[in-house]
């Protein structure tokens, strides 16, 4: 009989995509996968596209919800735990994988009450509150970066397989270095929601550098027309709302400018690319710490949001346009931090705890 895994992950791509990579690894080994999520977040639409059945509980964050939501919180959580209990009793998984998001809290409690072993994976350099608590009841704790937990196995972030199949950066960049002079290909990612500071600053840089660069700018949902208008039909820019084929985009790029979400950092390492990171400013400095994973080995440059001006960015880019060897060195350093077997290792741990 096939073994069963229940995945608890939701809210953002940083939680969902690594979990999908693990699911696919286990499906190849004959496992059945079911997903626990919420109806109003991205997993509701995304997960079924991978032919993975999904069950829903009602839970959301409390931030910004007001006093009434705080008063109702214990009852909301209890209701979500009971919903998760019913799903676990119906599905009877051999193990539960917690990958983060609000759904993981009630799901983790329900799994513990049903004596189902929990494997926890923290994607960020600093653990979220839900995972800090779940780590106390998990059978095994895994992490992408070595700083999240003092006692956990560091395995990296599972990333899409096609990134690991790209040519080694030394080969990729060598071919470009021997070609005729060409513009510096810059991949700009504002994230799925769009990063306003990036979307505002890059058009100024594109205008200043002209044909010395070519920009592919992923502007984020709802920003396509606005950003396109800002560029004013510049012939060194291509603007899209989303990028469907990330492997192709990374393969095209000489440099990436983006936020430093955990999955993005690990994808850039897997592809072997230099990066300029603009960490989202949050009180726990989560994205800044994610970025240091590559910056500390010389593979990336961190520019804090208040310093992300056109003038400062020009001062960084102009030397790189002239010194392509520097970009090659950064790309190779990034690739040394890749963890191509992360999904495989998470799958191995799940198999171990299910025995």
Curated annotation (Swiss-Prot):
Catalytic activity: di-trans,octa-cis-undecaprenyl diphospho-N-acetyl-alpha-D-muramoyl-L-alanyl-D-glutamyl-meso-2,6-diaminopimeloyl-D-alanyl-D-alanine + UDP-N-acetyl-alpha-D-glucosamine = di-trans,octa-cis-undecaprenyl diphospho-[N-acetyl-alpha-D-glucosaminyl-(1->4)]-N-acetyl-alpha-D-muramoyl-L-alanyl-D-glutamyl-meso-2,6-diaminopimeloyl-D-alanyl-D-alanine + UDP + H(+)
Membrane topology: Peripheral membrane protein
GO MF term set: UDP-N-acetyl-D-glucosamine:N-acetylmuramoyl-L-alanyl-D-glutamyl-meso-2,6-diaminopimelyl-D-alanyl-D-alanine-diphosphoundecaprenol 4-beta-N-acetylglucosaminlytransferase activity; undecaprenyldiphospho-muramoylpentapeptide beta-N-acetylglucosaminyltransferase activity
UniProt entry keywords in alphabetical sequence: Cell cycle, Cell division, Cell inner membrane, Cell membrane, Cell shape, Cell wall biogenesis/degradation, Glycosyltransferase, Membrane, Peptidoglycan synthesis, Transferase
Binding of UDP-N-acetyl-alpha-D-glucosamine, residues: 12-14, 124, 160, 192, 243, 262-267, 287
Signal peptide: none
InterPro entries documented for this protein: GlcNAc_MurG, Glyco_trans_28_C, GlycoTrans_28_N
Keyword Cell division: yes
Compartments reported by the entry: Cell inner membrane
GO cellular component: plasma membrane
Top-level enzyme category: transferase
Gene3D superfamilies in UniProt: Glycogen Phosphorylase B
UniProt GO BP: carbohydrate metabolic process; cell division; cell wall organization; lipid glycosylation; peptidoglycan biosynthetic process; regulation of cell shape
Pfam families: Glyco_tran_28_C, Glyco_transf_28
SUPFAM superfamilies the UniProt entry points to: UDP-Glycosyltransferase/glycogen phosphorylase
Metabolic or biological pathway, per its Swiss-Prot or TrEMBL entry: Cell wall biogenesis; peptidoglycan biosynthesis
Presence of keyword Cell membrane: yes
The EC number(s) this enzyme carries: 2.4.1.227
Function: Cell wall formation. Catalyzes the transfer of a GlcNAc subunit on undecaprenyl-pyrophosphoryl-MurNAc-pentapeptide (lipid intermediate I) to form undecaprenyl-pyrophosphoryl-MurNAc-(pentapeptide)GlcNAc (lipid intermediate II).
Family per similarity comment: Belongs to the glycosyltransferase 28 family. MurG subfamily.
Designated name of the protein: UDP-N-acetylglucosamine--N-acetylmuramyl-(pentapeptide) pyrophosphoryl-undecaprenol N-acetylglucosamine transferase
């Amino acid at each position: 009989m096939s073994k069963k895994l229940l995945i608890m992950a939701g809210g953002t791509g940083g939680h969902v995509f690594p979990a999908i990579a693990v699911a696919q690894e286990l499906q190849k080994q004959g496992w059945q996968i079911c997903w626990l999520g919420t109806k109003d977040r991205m997993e509701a639409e995304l997960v079924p596209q991978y032919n993975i059945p999904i069950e829903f509980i009602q839970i959301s964050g409390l931030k910004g919800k007001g006093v009434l939501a705080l008063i109702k919180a214990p009852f909301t959580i209890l209701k979500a735990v009971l919903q998760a209990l019913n799903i676990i009793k119906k599905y009877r998984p051999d193990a539960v994988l917690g990958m983060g998001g609000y759904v993981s809290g009630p799901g983790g409690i329900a799994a513990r009450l049903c004596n189902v072993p929990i494997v926890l994976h923290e994607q960020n350099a600093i653990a979220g509150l839900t995972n800090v608590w779940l780590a106390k009841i998990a059978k095994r704790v895994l992490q992408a970066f070595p700083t999240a937990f003092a006692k956990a196995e560091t395995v990296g972030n599972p990333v899409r397989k096609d990134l690991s199949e790209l040519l080694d950066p030394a080969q990729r960049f060598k071919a470009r270095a021997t070609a005729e002079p060409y513009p510096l290909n810059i991949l700009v990612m504002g994230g799925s929601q769009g990063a306003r500071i990036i979307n505002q600053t890059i058009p100024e840089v594109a205008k200043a550098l002209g044909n010395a660069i070519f920009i592919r700018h992923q502007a984020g949902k709802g920003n396509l027309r606005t950003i396109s208008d800002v560029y004013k039909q510049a012939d060194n820019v291509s603007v899209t709302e989303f990028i469907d084929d990330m492997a192709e985009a990374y393969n095209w790029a000489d440099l990436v400018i983006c936020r430093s979400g955990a999955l993005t950092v690990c994808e850039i390492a897997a592809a072997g690319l230099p990066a300029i990171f603009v960490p989202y400013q949050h009180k726990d400095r989560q994205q800044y710490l994610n970025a240091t994973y590559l910056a500390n080995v010389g593979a990336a440059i961190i520019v804090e949001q208040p310093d992300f001006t056109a003038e400062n960015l020009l001062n960084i880019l102009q030397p790189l346009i002239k010194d392509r060897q520097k970009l090659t060195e950064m790309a190779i350093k990034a690739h040394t931090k890749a963890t191509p077997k992360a999904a495989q290792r998470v799958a191995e741990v799940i198999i171990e705890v299910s025995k």
